[in-house]
UniProtKB/Swiss-Prot annotation:
GO MF assignments: cholesterol binding; ubiquitin protein ligase binding
Predominant place of localization: endoplasmic reticulum
SMART domains documented for this protein: PHB
Topological type in the membrane: Single-pass type II membrane protein
Lumenal membrane side: 24-331
A GO-annotated cellular component: endoplasmic reticulum membrane
UniProt keyword annotations, A-Z: Cholesterol metabolism, Endoplasmic reticulum, Glycoprotein, Lipid metabolism, Membrane, Signal-anchor, Steroid metabolism, Sterol metabolism, Transmembrane, Transmembrane helix
Protein's recorded name: Erlin-2
A GO biological-process term: cholesterol metabolic process
Length: 331
C-alpha cells in the first residue's frame, strides 16, 4: 500500500468521524444522547454540536406543540354495541427540563406509552359504562374535555412535564341501521325544536303587539286626561272671568245708582233750600213780567180769562197764582 493510499484512508476515516461527531438540533427540539445503549444525562439545545463518533448516538425530542393522532379506536358500549372512533387528536407539548426524565422512563417514543395507549384505555372505560345513546348523542360533547382532564391527571403523576393542551374527538362510527334510526330521530328532534322556536317567536310577537297596544291605550288615555284637564281649566278660567265681569258690572251699576241717588238727593236738598216763599213769590212776579200782553185799567185781573158777566176779582187772582206755578214748573 502506498503512502498516498494510506493518507487517503486516514483522511476518509477522519472525515467520517467528523461527520459522525457533528450533528444539528432543530429549533423547538432537545437532543438526548446514548452511548453504548445507555442514556446520558447531558442534553443539548438547538444548534450544531459534537459528540464522540461511532460510539455515541443522539435523538431529537420535540418540545413545541405537536398533535398525536390516534386512529380507529374500537369501543364497546354498555349495551354491547361496538363502535369505532376514526380519529382522536391529542395536542400536547413537552417542557424542556422534563425531557431527560421522560425519555429515561418511557424512551424517546414516549407518546406511544403515555398518549396512544392511554387514549385507548380511557375511551374503552368511558364506553363500557355508558349506552350508545350517551356516547353518540347525550354525552358526546363532553368526551373530549373529560378525556383531556383524565389524561392530564394521569400524566401529572406519571410523567410531569408533559402537558395536554387539547383533545379533539370525531363522531364515532356506528352500525348503519342504528345510524339511520339516529338520523331520523335527530331529524324529528330538529323539526320539534324548529316548531318550538317558531311558537316562541309567534308568542313573542303576540306579546310585543299586546305591549304595544297597552302602551298605545295608555298614551291615548293620558292624552284624553290632559285634554280633559285643559278643558276643566278653561271652564274654570271662564267662570272666574265671568265672576270678575259680573262683580265689575255690579260695582259699576252700584256706583252709578249711588251717583244718581246722590245727585237726586243733592238736587232735592237744593230745591228744598231754594223753594222758599220769597223765592216762589219772586218767580210768580217774573212769570207775570214775562207775559207779553199787558193790560192797563181797572180790569187787569180779567186778562187771564173771558170778561163775562159775574166774574170776580178773586177768580182772577187764583188764575194768576196757577199761571205762576205753571211757569215755575216749566223752569
Amino acid at each position: 500500500m502506498t503512502l498516498g493510499a494510506v493518507a487517503s484512508l486516514i483522511l476518509a476515516i477522519g472525515g467520517a468521524a467528523v461527520f459522525s461527531a457533528l450533528h444539528k438540533i432543530e429549533e423547538g427540539h432537545v437532543g438526548v444522547y446514548y452511548r453504548g445503549g445507555a442514556l446520558l444525562t447531558a442534553t443539548s439545545g438547538p444548534g450544531f454540536h459534537l459528540m464522540l463518533p461511532f460510539i455515541t448516538t443522539f435523538k431529537s425530542v420535540q418540545t413545541t406543540l405537536q398533535t398525536d393522532e390516534v386512529k380507529n379506536v374500537p369501543c364497546g358500549t354498555g349495551g354491547g354495541v361496538m363502535i369505532y372512533f376514526d380519529r382522536i387528536e391529542v395536542v400536547n407539548y413537552l417542557v424542556p427540563s422534563a425531557v431527560y426524565g421522560i425519555v429515561r422512563n418511557f424512551t424517546a417514543d414516549y407518546d406511544k406509552a403515555l398518549i396512544f395507549n392511554k387514549v385507548h384505555h380511557e375511551l374503552n372505560q368511558f364506553c363500557s359504562v355508558h349506552t350508545l345513546q350517551d356516547v353518540y348523542i347525550g354525552l358526546f360533547d363532553q368526551i373530549d374535555e373529560n378525556l383531556k382532564l383524565t389524561l392530564q391527571e394521569d400524566l401529572t403523576s406519571m410523567a410531569p412535564g408533559l402537558i395536554i393542551q387539547a383533545v379533539r374527538v370525531t363522531k364515532p362510527n356506528i352500525p348503519e341501521s342504528i345510524r339511520r334510526n339516529y338520523e331520523l330521530m335527530e331529524s324529528e328532534r330538529t323539526k320539534l325544536l324548529i316548531a318550538a322556536q317558531t311558537q316562541k317567536v309567534v308568542e313573542k310577537e303576540a306579546e310585543t303587539e299586546r305591549k304595544k297596544a297597552v302602551i298605545e291605550a295608555e298614551k291615548v288615555a293620558q292624552v284624553a286626561e290632559i285634554k280633559f284637564g285643559q278643558k276643566v281649566m278653561e271652564k274654570e278660567t271662564e267662570k272666574k272671568i265671568s265672576q270678575i265681569e259680573d262683580s265689575a258690572y255690579l260695582a259699576r251699576q252700584k256706583a252709578k245708582a249711588d251717583a244718581e241717588f246722590y245727585s237726586a238727593q243733592r238736587a232735592a236738598e237744593a230745591n228744598k233750600l231754594k223753594l222758599t216763599p220769597e223765592y216762589l213769590q219772586l218767580m210768580k212776579f217774573k212769570a207775570i213780567a214775562a207775559n207779553s200782553k199787558i193790560y192797563f185799567g181797572s180790569e187787569i185781573p180779567h186778562m187771564f180769562m173771558d170778561s163775562g158777566p159775574g166774574s170776580s176779582s178773586s177768580a182772577a187772582s187764583k188764575a194768576i197764582d196757577v199761571l205762576s206755578e205753571g211757569m215755575l214748573d216749566l223752569e
